[in-house]
Amino acid sequence: ELPGQKSRQEADAIRLRQALLPQLTVPKNQNMPLQQTGIRLSRALPYILHCSAKVELARQQVQLIFSNTGEQVAVFHVYNKLDLEAIPRRYMVEAGKQLDDIWSVHDGGYDLWVLGPNGFHRSFQGNLHSKLYSESLPEIRICVEECEPKIYLKLRSDGQKTAKLVIQANAYLNKSWHIETRTAETELLLDMSEWYGWYDFTVSLENEPEFKRRFAGRIETGKDSYSDPFIGYSV
């Protein structure tokens, strides 16, 4: 018999006594709790994750490629925002491994939302029926160095024509860049040292509002850092 164990009668008696106690009054005006602002020390994490998209125009498909160059297994969650009734796909990627999967488009369109640990976020949107998009097929991937909080943004065109891309910082950096892609990769360096490796930016295609790529998260360098400076703020 466990210490402190009560019989049913004893438990019922306790419940009845508690029911006779003064009840809490629910406030008429209620507010949602607010996240405390400011940064906190944050341990280094063993995740170095990558996710990029590749469009297969002839098959009307989108391929997502997941890679884990960190030291621990990681899980990616993918939501199809054009079919939210579908069960999200989940991928467990071992350290040093890579895998991929295919999504069919809906009337040419796709909108895939990828989530991972510690704020890792990728969003891939587009419409393959768009002439401007299908002729240029721009794609973007992120490369990082494991020792510095810097991003090497690599942009290219997989189509027959060049693409004019706009890179817009959503937080941290108050900047935007305009880059014309070619078949050979164009590289843009973003130094996020001032923000402890945290980043959030969107890449869009000029004159094509349906194409977007969003990248957010924290660059892991193997060193202890700080929590997200924008927690508690509206972005």
Language-model regions, residue ranges each:
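Membrane-interface soluble catalytic domains
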Residues: 1-235
